[in-house]
Amino acid sequence: MKKRLLLVLTFILFSKEINAQQNPNIMLSVFYKGESEKINNENSSAIYDAIYGMFENYNAISKEVSLKKFDEKEVFFKSTLSNEKLISCIDSLSKNSKLSLVTQFNKQQLVLESNFPSFFQKNNDLNFVKIKLKSFDAINENKKKIVIDSIHTTSENGGTLLDKDLTYHTIKFQDNINTSSKKATGFVTYNVKILTDYAIQKLNKSNLITTFSINKKEIKIVEIYNKIFVFDVLNESNEFNKKAENFNYWALDIDNKNERKLGSNMSYLIYKDLYNIFKLNRKITKEELKKLLPVEKLQKMKENGFYNVIEHDFAFDNTIFFYSKIYGVSKDIKVKI
């Protein structure tokens, strides 16, 4: 089951009334970066449309559900390799790494390419691996320092492997840069983590516990409504980028026949102010929304923080396995460019 890290941009897709002429930059800023202060009278109409579309989506569910027998070992697959062997895989990855500058979609990118040893691909697939750029110290042909576009790195990559071949052997990891360069000289440090275990909390909607600890995080369930699982992480920063980076949660819905529902599984952050309004009024109109959240309140939404959301196509109505992945093996690699 794949989780798309922080699809807050989905808010835009929820709205049926936003046409292609609208400037997407404000949507990216408000919903993908948590920059509510950029809302103003000129763009507020599109923002209200997006919020209203999101609320409509929360009230709609897919009636056709595909089921599959729940196999815990299959879902929570673990590596058969020892931690020492996994460390040697990272060492091999470091040794085989190559960095290059490429231009794609009119944007210059720093590209890391490498591969794991053959014994790794027999025991794991690359979804087990998270890669994050930690530091970048390089200059271009004019001796000007090259700067990574940190927003792109955090929001789009965030440890996600963007490309892998059919043998799950070669990896490719990309970061945008905002300094025009024909060549680069220097070093890049990446952190590489490998999945080793899962922290699992079994929940029952008919007798729901609302607070629990998982993977060193304190979770408070705000609500499980229809197809969305809304929760707060109490012992972490409420700042958007940090919450986005730490989003490491999934949920499985298991019926009384021990079957799990299949479908899309999205994860993202939502402004607390928005969800609290929806929780009180499922059928809120646009006019009511505008009265409760005038532009000046929209602008201040990020001050009150964000909830975490897991969204499925179908309603949560059975036993729920809420889980977090544990990356027990971690090591930095330094690559020359």
Where are the regions a protein language model picked out?
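Alpha-helical, hydrophobic structural elements that either
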Residues: Q22-I337
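Bacterial Sec-dependent N-terminal signal peptides
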Residues: M1-N25
